[in-house]
């Protein structure tokens, strides 16, 4: 069963690999590294000691913005995206976050995941 853990500096190379494979217009390694700090809730999805995906989320007061979410394309379609997003939302609720914002292109297939989870 997969688990969620905070992202660490040592994860960045693997996250960058996933980012490059999962997105048509991927973030640079520098952008990934710059989206960390006390105002972020960044999680990695791990199963059998392998990082399969991640979420980058910034929090401000009682709101959060999901900046990036990615699952290794080899692992897509197995429910990992739902697990990651639901886990992120649960952790945000624990922190008192009431609202999660995100921006998504209408053509992005992940839109259906976002709609499904509300």
Where are these regions (language model features)?
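Acetyl-CoA-dependent GNAT
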Residues: 2, 6-74, 82-87, 91-95
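Amphipathic alpha-helical segments that mediate coupling or scaffolding at interfaces
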Residues: 34-35, 103, 107
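Short Asp/Glu-rich motifs
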Residues: 38, 111-112
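Helix-turn-helix DNA-binding elements, focusing on the entry/boundary residues of the two helices
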Residues: 66, 110-111
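Short glycine/proline-centered loop/turn elements that form peptide/ligand docking sites
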Residues: 81, 85, 107-110
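Conserved GNAT acetyl-CoA-binding A-motif
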Residues: 92-103, 113
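Conserved acetyl-CoA-binding loop of GNAT-fold acetyltransferases
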Residues: 115-118
């Amino acid at each position: 069963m997969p688990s969620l853990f905070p992202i660490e500096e040592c994860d960045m190379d693997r996250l960058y690999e996933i980012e490059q494979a999962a997105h048509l217009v991927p973030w640079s390694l520098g952008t990934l590294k710059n989206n960390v700090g006390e105002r972020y809730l960044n999680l990695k999805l791990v199963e059998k000691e392998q990082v399969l995906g991640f979420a980058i989320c910034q929090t401000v007061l009682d709101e959060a913005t999901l900046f990036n979410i990615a699952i290794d394309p080899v692992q897509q379609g197995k429910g990992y995206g739902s697990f990651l997003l639901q886990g992120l939302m649960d952790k945000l609720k624990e922190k008192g976050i009431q609202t999660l914002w995100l921006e998504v292109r209408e053509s992005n297939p992940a839109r259906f995941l976002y709609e499904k989870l509300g």
